């Protein structure tokens, strides 16, 4: 009934946690015998003209590699799948009784980005926009340069950590561009951040230092 209501009321866009378009694998990953049925629901939404923001939480050895290629092939064929985001699974120490999961490393994260880039190029040629994006964390793990803000279009998957780095950098650059260079009494500022965001905060802190003589930013 809920599916019919969404279609009838044309609730759009909607967010869909896809993870994989392989029905058997989705049942295994979700530990739900009905989990494979969501794929036919996605097809119904697409046929009804409902825009889809799709998320793929990737687990190394499960739904990355060839399975990721399969999922992106299926999703990129849907005209109304307007954004597809791949994000890495978060692994904590509290996994007693659960499936053993590995975290992504430099090599496996880089492999995901390569696949994403290929399908993004395909989508850009077919639809005029990239549609397929990797979360910022993949670039950090792979030690690769983050794309520019222009790469992310309308930033449809910010809540999934896609393009947050590029957007923040652009917002700081735009704000500084509208600010006159100033000088004044020496001033020291301390900024605390996490390990993943450290390079970004250092880079924007340097931009601020260049704009304001006498400013010293220390990032921890």
List the model feature ranges, each with a label.
Residues 1-79, 90-119:
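Conserved Radical SAM active-site core
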Residues 76, 83-85, 90-220:
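Auxiliary Fe-S-binding modules of radical SAM enzymes
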